[in-house]
């Protein structure tokens, strides 16, 4: 390529930098995890660590490990050819110094030595920075890095080395549980991408990720658990280069929105203008689909486009794209209207909004490379892989609001399966206060079959409310003997246990009261008392009847006198009813019938003054 072409390309690259510098609120963010010293010289002290942009950070989780220093191989630029042993039962966290070789190689060598995680100690005094992969190369081992790693400040690294040199054991907790903000029950995330499929390894990784993550993304979006937005990086052509061949082939709308041709073949094949045009179309596909409340269709479109309209197969065209749009039932006219005229000297509202997002805001960093994933305004760090990204998204839900897909055993450990998570449980009723969450577990008294349990969730949970006795008898005493059951739980009371009548105790344990022995009942003269479980029997002498409520005996009368008295009462009642019926007929019913007869006869026989004295009919 000629020197003039090189200068033009350099100017285009620097254009973004100029925009970034001029953006008042734009800045780069370092995504961090937390380190806590669990023993040794500064127990409980917390430190920040910068998450590496490769490997697999444990988003939403944590790990505890014993720190080991690499010693004479401190830089870790060559294979250690050994494993680092410690007396601690915890996994090994290898401490390596920064310098000499790239970050990723150090972490790879640490993983090969058996380390569960790697800490890189900075070798200069500076704020934390993000460890990234080499830009001019992409070694094969990058995708094989599976462990988490982080950069720490030089001062903290020096403190760790001194403690280890003194022979102290250093136990650290590496915590990613708050690395992704988790404010509510919906996660908002965005993917900064590019439609160019001939830009090398980065493009291939992006295409593979979209294809593999599509199913999960659509489940989350359809369920209303997430809000997804696609974004595309664009550049600005400097005004002095607007008429150059480079700007004309890489930009639309008179140099306002450009996509660099990484091959720098400005006259052959596809160029940046084609790419930024398709970027805009994909943004419009999402916009139109969202208006139909089917925003997840974007994943179908992009997946199909990568398969059917590939640059490598010379099918990257407007016609191919529009065929996919129509096959998905989207309005082609609305999408064309959204795209507008790419040759017009006007701003495009969709791409203008993209520039604002790209420059970042006060609470989020600037985006300069693709693919970049943002989750709740935090930049995702690590390998762009389906399960790893799902873990990061799941860590963005407020605890106990995550969807079931986040509690799959493939991506999280159910802590309730190990010693019930340290929470209260009732094995008899199979009720537990342990609730599995993506970031761990919570101990919270449950609601079972409409019955609310109350307590601290760790050592105690008791059923509460009207139906509490249906759950393990409300944790109250209950016993059955010879088919007879007594309980100290009452549905009329919302809490507490009270021994029933005939028993004495605290409600958790009740003992039968011997009323006969204590002479609390059957105290009448000549009575004989017999104690039963939960009660007693009392018999009177001389064939008398025992009245329990009064605790007394009454004389039983002879059968003949009783029958005679009963007969007299019945006959008297019958006579009274007959007399009442006769009086009713005589004075009320007869009067009513007389008036009815007068009314009927008046319709057929003329009567004096249209009335007849009722007495004349009596």
Swiss-Prot record:
Keyword Membrane: yes
Gene3D superfamilies cross-referenced by the UniProt entry: 3.50.30.30, Laminin (2.10.25.10)
Pfam families: PA, VSR_TRX
Signal sequence extent: 1-23
Membrane-crossing residue ranges in chain numbering: 564-584
Paired cysteines (S-S): 416-434, 423-443, 445-461, 469-489, 476-497, 499-510, 540-553
Tissues expressing this chain: Expressed in seedlings, roots, leaves, flowers and siliques.
Cytoplasmic side: 585-618
InterPro entries: EGF-like_Ca-bd_dom, EGF_Ca-bd_CS, PA_dom_sf, PA_domain, VSR_TRX
GO terms classed as biological process: protein transport
GO cellular component terms, semicolon-separated: clathrin-coated vesicle membrane; Golgi membrane
Motif (Tyrosine-based internalization motif): 604-607
Free-text function comment from the UniProt entry: Vacuolar-sorting receptor (VSR) involved in clathrin-coated vesicles sorting from Golgi apparatus to vacuoles.
Protein name: Vacuolar-sorting receptor 5
